[in-house]
Amino acid sequence: MDIWEKLYTQAKKEYHPEDVTPFVYAHHVVCALESADGTTYTGFCIEACSGVMNLCAERVTALNMYVNSGQTKIRRLIAFRDEAPSGGGSGMPCGACREFLYQLNEENENMEIMVNYETREIVTLKDLMPNWWGKERYEQSRL
């Protein structure tokens, strides 16, 4: 079993769309990541009618990693709905998630994101955001 199969299998366990209440819907998008130390974490999307409660699976998973380990650096990430990513944009983090992952740790620009599970095609966060606006702030923080 390669790392991508492990991540897919763990994330798939979280996939069971449900109405938590008449206002909150969850588990319809799932995610798993491998942290810098090799530990895997999972999460799921949760949405509420108010809109401000909505959290994508990628952000929930990254927050699970941070809350449970204090880590912020991610090696690999897979996200999907009912099937593994199959190219054409399926499984790609939204703009808010991309931004959060970059802000969480600048080294996350090198994290691998699954594009097509079957062919093992990946991209990096840097591929998705080649001219990220926050690099300058990270550089200034090191002065």
Protein language model features and the residues they cover:
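Gly/Ser-rich catalytic serine loop of serine hydrolases
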Residues: 29-30, 53, 91
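Histidine- and/or cysteine-centered catalytic micro-motif in compact active-site loops
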Residues: 34-36, 45-48, 82
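C-terminal binding/interaction regions
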Residues: 2-21, 71-143
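Compact, glycine-rich, soluble single-domain proteins
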Residues: 45-59
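Short amphipathic alpha-helical face segments that pack within enzyme cores
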Residues: 56, 60, 96-99
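Short, solvent-exposed cationic patches
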Residues: 57-79
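Hydrophobic "anchor" residues
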Residues: 39-40
